[in-house]
């Protein structure tokens, strides 16, 4: 059986495995120029409370970034949620990962391929509707665009591998044109880019969202960074060893004794003797 719905439609949680893995990759490749890891917060499937007058109203983005806030709440505690009026900061970036049946919630009138630059006034989600139970929370689009004014709102579909970017300009979201063959967008306010990268993450090879730097290089995860560091150390050690070998060979060929070569290069006599025998001893 595949993709069966929950028996409780109100049950919260991640809709699929991709919604767990993709946010991890976003957080683990994030490297900001002006904010260290202790001065930014990333949330995944976390309640984002946005209206102090209606303190229970919230949205739950798949992933969001807030900069210039402590990584830990009040500098010492993990967050259970993110309360905008308490933190004094709204997200700079929100990423939603499309799920079947949720397109209108995430994209509003942009669900269709056609972009409506001047939507009819009656489609604007800027009014809070009322019903018999009272005031209802506004649409997600209104919250991100009008209430929080999130500078960058990005939507990605794992089914089509399509990335869409909406940038907040003059009070409204404007969709940014991306190259379908190489979808990337540069977030100038944060000096970092986001694009669609095809590769392996957590043992799964597919298209993923991933951050890149000003030179266009994909930013590594912490694991990849450590692997690169270890490889660089290995190569540096091999280079030093090769230089020592060459220097020892040159000195021996010049007529110096093994003791003299060992003293000059700081090597053990046995190493120099081994070099005499093999010509390629690795130190």
Question: Model-found features: residue ranges?
Answer:
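C-terminal interaction segment
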Residues: 1-15, 32, 53-54, 72-93, ...
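Generic internal hydrophobic packing segments that stabilize the cores of diverse globular domains
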Residues: 23, 27, 60, 91-92, ...
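Short, His- and charge-rich active-site/binding loops that engage polyanionic ligands
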Residues: 37-39, 44-81, 85-86
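Short, basic interhelical loop/turn and adjoining N-cap
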Residues: 265-275
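Alpha-helical DNA-recognition elements
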Residues: 278
């Amino acid at each position: 059986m595949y993709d069966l719905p929950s028996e409780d439609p109100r049950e919260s949680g991640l809709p699929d495995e991709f919604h767990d893995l993709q946010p991890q990759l976003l957080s683990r490749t994030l490297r900001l120029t002006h904010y260290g890891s202790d001065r930014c917060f990333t949330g995944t499937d976390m309640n984002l409370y946005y209206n102090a007058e209606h303190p229970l109203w919230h949205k739950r983005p798949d992933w969001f970034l807030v900069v210039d806030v402590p990584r830990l709440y009040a500098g010492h505690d993990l967050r259970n949620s993110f309360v905008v009026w308490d933190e004094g900061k709204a997200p700079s970036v929100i990423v939603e990962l499309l799920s079947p049946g949720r397109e209108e919630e995430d994209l509003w009138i942009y669900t269709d391929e056609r972009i409506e630059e001047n939507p009819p006034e009656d489609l604007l989600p800027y009014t809070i509707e009322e019903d018999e139970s009272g005031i209802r929370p506004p649409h997600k689009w209104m919250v991100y665009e009008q209430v929080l004014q999130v500078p960058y709102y990005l939507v990605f579909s794992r089914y089509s591998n399509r990335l869409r970017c909406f940038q907040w300009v003059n009070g409204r979201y404007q969709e940014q044109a991306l190259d379908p063959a190489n979808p990337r967008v540069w977030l100038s306010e944060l000096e970092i880019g986001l694009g669609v990268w095809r590769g392996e993450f957590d043992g799964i090879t597919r298209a993923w969202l991933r951050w890149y730097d000003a030179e266009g290089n994909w930013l590594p995860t912490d694991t990849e960074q450590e692997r690169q560091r270890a490889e660089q150390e290995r190569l540096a050690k091999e280079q030093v060893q090769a230089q020592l070998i060459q220097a020892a060979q040159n000195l021996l060929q010049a007529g110096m004794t093994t003791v003299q070569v060992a003293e000059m290069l700081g090597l053990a006599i046995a190493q120099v003797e081994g070099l005499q025998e093999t010509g390629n001893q690795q130190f």
